[in-house]
Amino acid sequence: MGKSCKVVVCGQASVGKTSILEQLLYGNHVVGSEMIETQEDIYVGSIETDRGVREQVRFYDTRGLRDGAELPKHCFSCTDGYVLVYSTDSRESFQRVELLKKEIDKSKDKKEVTIVVLGNKCDLQEQRRVDPDVAQHWAKSEKVKLWEVSVADRRSLLEPFIYLASKMTQPQSKSAFPLSRKNKGSGSLDG
């Protein structure tokens, strides 16, 4: 196991952020159970990457954002990844994700962070308000991966989180500027 990664889970209130984490990590979410508003919680999980390595991930479950409120500033420091959650039955929650993505882009400096977008409640087809093609087109233009998921189907949650853990813990590629032995101490890059 390598370093522990910090992932901030954010989105509008009542889109299912906590339910997603509870179902993913513990398999104990009951659809239709009473919603309790989250202030802020931390969940720790061990996720097997696509390389077969288990990585520890700390999920910062944030309070649902309401009425133009921004993500707290501490959510931007030392963060390796973000899970932006909207509900497929709420156009407003998708618009909030679009704003969050812009906020993250402004705040992340030059640091590389992995962003995954989840459209929750995809099983509620008759209440759908977010066109999946529009959402995928937006995700592609923003260079983020988007999955539609349902807390009722735990398997739908696995792929996005395996992708997230795998992407955040990719081995660093070799430097584009390898120094040969004879140059190491000279400070000169020419042979």
Curated annotation (Swiss-Prot):
It is found in: Cytoplasm. Gene3D superfamilies: P-loop containing nucleotide triphosphate hydrolases. It comes from the Eukaryota. Residues 169-191 are annotated as: Disordered. One of its GO terms (cellular component) is cytoplasm. Its main location: cytoplasm. Interacts with both NF-kappa-B inhibitor alpha (NFKBIA) and beta (NFKBIB) in vitro. However, it probably only interacts with NFKBIB in vivo. Interacts with GFOD1. One of its GO terms (biological process) is negative regulation of canonical NF-kappaB signal transduction. Pfam families: Ras (PF00071). This is NF-kappa-B inhibitor-interacting Ras-like protein 2. A motif (Effector region) lies at residues 35-43. One of its GO terms (molecular function) is GTP binding. GTP binds at residues 11-18, 61-65, 120-123. The keyword Nucleotide-binding applies. Keywords: Cytoplasm, GTP-binding, Nucleotide-binding. In contrast to other members of the Ras family, the members of the KappaB-Ras subfamily do not contain the conserved Gly and Gln residues in positions 13 and 65, which are replaced by Ala and Leu residues, respectively, and are therefore similar to the constitutively active forms of oncogenic forms of Ras. This suggests that members of this family are clearly different from other small GTPases proteins. Belongs to the small GTPase superfamily. Ras family. KappaB-Ras subfamily. Atypical Ras-like protein that acts as a potent regulator of NF-kappa-B activity by preventing the degradation of NF-kappa-B inhibitor beta (NFKBIB) by most signals, explaining why NFKBIB is more resistant to degradation. May act by blocking phosphorylation of NFKBIB and nuclear localization of p65/RELA NF-kappa-B subunit. It is unclear whether it acts as a GTPase. Both GTP- and GDP-bound forms block phosphorylation of NFKBIB. Disulfide bonds: none annotated. The keyword GTP-binding applies. The lineage of its organism: Eukaryota, Metazoa, Chordata, Craniata, Vertebrata. Residues 1-191 are annotated as: Small GTPase-like.
